Curated annotation (Swiss-Prot):
Belongs to the glycosyl hydrolase 7 (cellulase C) family. PANTHER family: 1,4-BETA-D-GLUCAN CELLOBIOHYDROLASE A-RELATED, 1,4-BETA-D-GLUCAN CELLOBIOHYDROLASE B. It comes from Aspergillus niger (strain ATCC MYA-4892 / CBS 513.88 / FGSC A1513). This is Probable 1,4-beta-D-glucan cellobiohydrolase A. Residues 1-17 form the signal peptide.
Amino acid sequence: MHQRALLFSALLTAVRAQQAGTLTEEVHPSLTWQKCTSEGSCTEQSGSVVIDSNWRWTHSVNDSTNCYTGNTWDATLCPDDETCATNCALDGADYESTYGVTTDGDSLTLKFVTGSNVGSRLYLMDTSDEGYQTFNLLDAEFTFDVDVSNLPCGLNGALYFTAMDADGGASKYPANKAGAKYGTGYCDSQCPRDLKFIDGQANVDGWEPSSNNDNTGIGNHGSCCPEMDIWEANKISTALTPHPCDSSEQTMCEGNDCGGTYSDDRYGGTCDPDGCDFNPYRMGNDSFYGPGKTIDTGSKMTVVTQFITDGSGSLSEIKRYYVQNGNVIANADSNISGVTGNSITTDFCTAQKKAFGDDDIFAEHNGLAGISDAMSSMVLILSLWDDYYASMEWLDSDYPENATATDPGVARGTCDSESGVPATVEGAHPDSSVTFSNIKFGPINSTFSASA
């Protein structure tokens, strides 16, 4: 994943804060999902979703004065990190009319552009509606249905997990009065520095407004944690990517020591910003995923991901299956010379990095073992976004831009390099959307029929 948080273009006044406002009631849209014990034996869970606090209107605790407008902090309310956290509150959300988020039973639809808002990021809440639902992915299987038929080049309808705190960080950082109810506590392997509040304090100090996005900027601090990208996709390309970190929990970083695409040294932090990705097109299989292909993105599909452990209980393999039109379809096999298989293993990742000439940052952060410890408690995230850093070329086009398209690993999909420029995709495809539904979780082979 490339600079996920910075790349979101949010509502004009979107901001992360640590106080809870009272001007708009916060009501989480309901979303059901299923917990399974064996094939055909699943129990419905009554959950809900909450939008990330970076999208919310944030204002003075005393009135409706904005704490943050465009990509600039109010100098009076926010002269420094601690004062800003005390002075500012984030408020409730109107999910459909402001953010284009709707639910229906077990289905969640995210619309791309709604008024001045672009994209969204949401978390699954637990049945109490007080904290995030957490999942232990080890020796488990996660399955969902997805419709990407309305996601053109340059967009990313993502479903992934990170090692966020279940309460949004409220217990660790008492200054955070908003907590999970208001979508606080985000972290990922990019150690995002565009978050307006981290660990109960604002990110005002050192804040630099973005040069190409009127709504975002970068502060001195970032928020790091392991990340498991189960699904990053549009109708052209898809990628499955684990990202390890040196710590299994959320940590705050500072400046260029954060690494990732927010910093001068991409690989200077404690996490792997690139991960070990399995994109069928990048692995040399250009007939597997897309409109009219083996996995036909013109129709809804079921996506199955299995997390296999070794004898010691540590993650050793990530396997992928699809179910479409009643057929179970194994993941595409690699067609890259020197790289074999259709699942993510240590051997696959080592061979892939060598074949593509990539720095093996994955191994430097302990590879699959580096994410395994975090997988006992991860939070589910569902989002739709466009990319102000690399126009989503890393997912669906040729990347890096100056590389030769025929070199191994450069071609990620068939999209034109200009198709994902945010101004282009926002102007041409504002009504794009993604729908996630029928989420199931349980032991291996419990969430789908292998003989479908």
